[in-house]
Amino acid sequence: MQTRGTQAGLHIPECSLSYAKTIIKLNDMSTLLRQHAEQQFAEELHELKKNEAYPVPENWEMSPQSVVTYLMGGTLKDGFVVTPKYIGNRRLMEIAVATLVTDRALLLYGLPGTAKSWVSEHIAAAISGNSTLIVQGTAGTGEEAIRYGWNYARLLAEGPTEGALVQTPVMKAMQEGKIGRIEELTRIGSDVQDTLITILSEKTLPIPELNREVQAVKGFNIIATANNRDKGVNDLSSALKRRFNTVILPLPDTIEEEVDIVRRRVESFEKVMELPAEKPALDEIRRVVTIFRELRQGATADGKTKLKSPSGTLSTAEAISVVNNGLAMAGYFGDGQIHASDLVSGILGAVVKDPVQDKVVWQEYMETVLKNRNGWKDIYRASREMM
């Protein structure tokens, strides 16, 4: 391990100096609305590297085993506790991380709100120490967002030169041996998507204007995300699909899993936003999650009553937003304690996307389920008032 001398003649490990600098930077970033994963969880990443016991692939920050521990949580040899970032099937995370050791890229696929972007960010943070090499896919994303672009003022003045070249996050990831991220891949036009084929198969990016190419350094790979239930998406070509290993992220299997996810994310949000409201009772979170799961699955939890499902996905991410909104309502326009009336407005906003069909779905749910369920009369009354 490299050391650096101090005036007192002490030798401090380079990793400790790096970690200390990171902590100083984090103190300066306390006013940020949202920190990157590598900033927010810098201590955990540092401890995992310090306790590393497995071989580390070239240009990775830690071993694949440690990356999975970072994602799933666990207790290290020295007793340090790593918090879980993903609550679900561990095998899915092992498959995702193992894919990135190979020459195939990773496609995280699933319904909106199933933590695809969240997992992508944390995998990149753990492997590369940098989750910011990202391309946000939209219908207007062009080839220059994936391959490279030009500073047109310099291009006109100098012609195609290195100084006029504008590097993309993908190009930087190739040169630095890091993980590049592409969000909402299927929102990008099919012709633009296919510019990835050469990058993923040949690991090169030709720049014919400069008569050269960029060759990927070991450690480079791509994580892409895509929704399987969305309007305005472009299917991947069969050639591009072959370059990806697809991992489907499902909705939480059990209500306990989903409640735990919502609770953890709400507590994190409350800490960052410093809301003047008390931590929501677990029962309130459970009620929101129960409503979402029942409407999503088209039946009550006991399976006795069939229900209509609304047009929206009612994902875990939306449940988190509903509780966060309820906290804000309680803190600024209530008594600081979260009540049914604070939650109902958010629930209605998530459920009633179509003002005609979804409204009917919610009204039927109110009258057949909420009205007759013990201890839920407050939500029923608040819903009636809002409707």
State where each predicted segment sits.
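Non-catalytic, well-ordered alpha-helical scaffold segments
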Residues: 90, 94, 168, 194, ...
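C-terminal engagement/docking regions of AAA+ P-loop ATPases
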Residues: 331-387
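Conserved AAA+ ATPase small/helical "lid" subdomain
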Residues: 266-337
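AAA+ P-loop NTPase catalytic core and its hallmark functional loops
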Residues: 26-274
